Amino acid sequence: MNPTTNRIGIVAIVDDDADIREALASLLMASSFTIDTFSSAEAFLQFPQRKEVRCLILDVHLPGMNGVELQKRLLDAGEKVPIVFISANGNSSVRDLAMKAGAAAFLHKPVRAKTLLQEIEAALKSSRVQS
């Protein structure tokens, strides 16, 4: 994938649905974000530039390690990247678990473009304030 103008670092998208990854990538590139996409949590963990990721768009249900498990793994490693979860499942216990662990937002699929962009901007602002 060809990165566009780098406004803030990398926004990573982790979703096992290729159509969703492509749609989210197109939306974010049109908004001048540099993006990288991954089909699994394990693929994201192998990403050499993982420390450059400034926001993570993360599906809850993934093959292998799920999104909440990835969130825990990152936190345990001291990586405090803002996470915007997206899920087709409205399970409030999963939402509560993710939010208690520090997720920036928890959105339900289908995600409205404007809402997602607002949540990403808010997460990025919040992480800059905490830095």
What residue spans do the PLM features occupy?
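Non-catalytic signal-transmission and effector/linker regions of two-component phosphorelay proteins
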Residues: M1-A12, A18-A25, S40, K114-S131
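The feature encodes the CheY-like receiver
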Residues: R21, P63, N91
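Acidic, metal-coordinating helix/loop segments flanking the phosphotransfer/catalytic sites
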Residues: T37-C55
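Acidic catalytic/metal-coordinating carboxylates
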Residues: S39-S40, N66-E69
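Active-site residues of response regulator receiver
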Residues: D59, S87
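Short amphipathic alpha-helix used as the core "switch/output" element in two-component signaling
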Residues: V68-E79
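Alpha4 helix (beta4-alpha4-beta5 surface) of REC/receiver domains from two-component response regulators
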Residues: E69, G90-A105
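A Lys-centered signature of the CheY-like receiver
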Residues: K109
